[in-house]
């Protein structure tokens, strides 16, 4: 973990790095379990069972005061999830890590509303982004900044998506 350049972006925050590394490792285990379960189910001509007990939470909330690194932590976590290096979580060297850290990965949507109060339309934009299946990897990641500015109606509209995201989001 310490040699991984995506984690180097989290200056001096070993606790956050370890938490995100562990979560990304759980996500990889979940993908392997789903793949194995689907292969077994196909071999047995059954419907694949959903794997839920992986220890990986599909919705994350990064909190802290402005300037505390929330956006950087979210970007690093997104990079670890889309990293294509099978041996190193968040290697920072593969094309997917570089694209994620550079803000151009097709499976990462970064939404930064500029309004002081974020309404239902912006919440619907997040919901639509979360419903899209990943195109390059195993996970679709939506980073939605300034969620503390959501109106009550917008927060309610977004709640179900946050509580019950699609399988690979």
Predicted regions and their residues:
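P-loop/Walker A NTP-binding region and its immediately flanking N-terminal helices
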Residues: 1-153
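Conserved catalytic/switch belt of AAA+ P-loop NTPases
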Residues: 131, 156-169
